Amino acid sequence: MYSNFKEQAIEYVKQAVHEDNAGNYNKAFPLYMNALEYFKTHLKYEKNPKIREAITQKFTEYLRRAEEIRAVLDEGGSGPGSNGDAAVATRPKTKPKDGEGGGKDGEDPEQSKLRAGLNSAIVREKPNIKWSDVAGLESAKQALQEAVILPVKFPQFFTGKRRPWRAFLLYGPPGTGKSYLAKAVATEADSTFFSVSSSDLVSKWMGESEKLVSNLFEMARESAPSIIFVDEIDSLCGTRGEGNESEASRRIKTELLVQMQGVGHNDEKVLVLAATNTPYALDQAIRRRFDKRIYIPLPEAKARQHMFKVHLGDTPHNLTEPDFEYLGQKTEGFSGSDVSVCVKDVLFEPVRKTQDAMFFFKSPDGTWMPCGPRHPGAIQTTMQDLATKGLAEKIIPPPITRTDFEKVLARQRPTVSKSDLDVHERFTQEFGEEG
C-alpha cells in the first residue's frame, strides 16, 4: 500500500516541474509541497536503505526548490506576468527534471541507485595483460578475437549472415587462466568491459536481483560495443529444480535467460563472457545460451615454460633456455595458478639466502652480495652487521638460479586432481570444445 504514496508523490513532482518550467510559480509551489508530504509519508514505511537514501536526496532537492519559489512569491512574483526576471534569477542552475523523481532521463530513484551500484563493475583502467601474456590456449584466443577484436576494428567483415559470436563459456579446473584470459580481453578490446560476480547481482531485497540483471544488460547495450564478464557463473545459474534453490535464485536465472536470448538475437554488439570451474552445475537452459563453450585445460609444457618467463619478468636471474625447458617438463600437472605460486615462492629464495648468509663480498659498484667463504673478496659478516654499519641500502640479494626452483618444486604439489580433469574432459566430449 505504501508504494501508492511514492507514486502520488512522483505525479505531483511531474506537475510541479511542468509549472515550474513554465514560470507558473504560484501553481508550482503547492504542487511541490504536496509531493513533499507524500514523500515524507512514504519514507516512514520504506525499509530499503538504498531507496530511502535516494528519496531523501530528492526530498532535499525539492524542498530547496520550494523554498526558493516561496521567496520569489513573498517578493510579489507569481509567474511570467509578475516579476518574471526575479523568478528566473532565483532558479537553481539544475532544476528537477520532468520525470519520476528527477532521475536521469526519467529514471526513478530506485533505478538510479541500482545503476550507481553497477557502475563499479565497469573496468575503467585496462588490466595491462596482452594476448602474448596468455600462454597457450590458441583456439580460445582466436575465437575471442573473432568475437571481440574483429567486429570493432573490421566491421565490414560481418555482413549478410556472418555475425560475431555473442556468448562464451570458459570452463576448466581452477587456476587454468579463465579470469586471466578475460583480463586480456579487457585490455585488448576497444569496448566497455563489465566485470561482475554473483555478489554484484544478488540482493537481499525481494525483486531487486532481477532488476540488477536487467539494468546490467541495459547499461551494456547503451555502452555498446561492450563485454559482460560473469565470473563463477555457476553460483548464479545452478540447475533449476534443486532442493536448495530459492525463489529469488529462480527469478535471477529467468531474467538472465531472457536477457541473453535478447543479446543473441539482436545485433547489439554485446558479448557475454562467463567462467566456471563446475560446468555440470550449470542449468541446461543457461548452457544452451552460450554459442561457444571452450575448455581451458591445464597448460602444456611449452605454455608452462612461457609462464615461468612471464612471472619472473625482469627479476635478476641466470636461467638459460634449457633451464626453462627443464622447468616446463618438471611441472607436469601444474595449473597456471600453481606455476604462479611456485615463482612467487622462488622469488623469496634469494632473500632467504641473504638473511642466512655468513659471508658477503663487495662488488665494484659498492653493493654487497652474499657469497660462499671461498669467493674472491669474501668477508665474514652478516646482513644485520652490515645494516648496523649503515649499509642496509647497499645489500643486494643474488640472482635467481635453477637450484632455487628445484628447492621449491621439491615441496610443491599440483592442486588439480585426476578426477577433476576427468569431469571436465567428459563435459568437453558432451557439450564443449578444446581451447
Swiss-Prot record:
InterPro entries assigned: AAA+_ATPase, ATPase_AAA_core, ATPase_AAA_CS, MIT_dom, MIT_dom_sf, MT-severing_AAA_ATPase, P-loop_NTPase, Spast_Vps4_C
Entry's localization field: Cytoplasm; Nucleus; Endosome, Multivesicular body membrane; Prevacuolar compartment membrane
Listed SMART domains: AAA (SM00382), MIT (SM00745)
Keywords for the protein's UniProt record, in alphabetical order: ATP-binding, Cell cycle, Cytoplasm, Endosome, Hydrolase, Membrane, Nucleotide-binding, Nucleus, Protein transport, Transport
Domain MIT: from-to ranges: 7-72
Binding site residues for ATP: 172-179
Biased composition (Basic and acidic residues): 95-113
Tissues/organs with expression: Mostly expressed in leaves, to a lower extent in seeds, and barely in roots and flowers (at protein level). Particularly expressed in trichomes.
Induction (free text): By Pseudomonas syringae pv. tomato strain DC3000 (PstDC3000).
Positions of transmembrane segments: none
Function comment: Involved in the transport of biosynthetic membrane proteins from the prevacuolar/endosomal compartment to the vacuole. Required for multivesicular body (MVB) protein sorting. Catalyzes the ATP-dependent dissociation of class E VPS proteins from endosomal membranes, such as the disassembly of the ESCRT-III complex. May also regulate cell cycle. Required during seed development for the formation of mucilage in seed coat and testa. Involved in the maintenance of Na(+)/K(+) homeostasis under salt stress. Required for cell expansion.
Family: Belongs to the AAA ATPase family.
Protein name: Protein SUPPRESSOR OF K(+) TRANSPORT GROWTH DEFECT 1
Recorded name of the encoding gene: SKD1
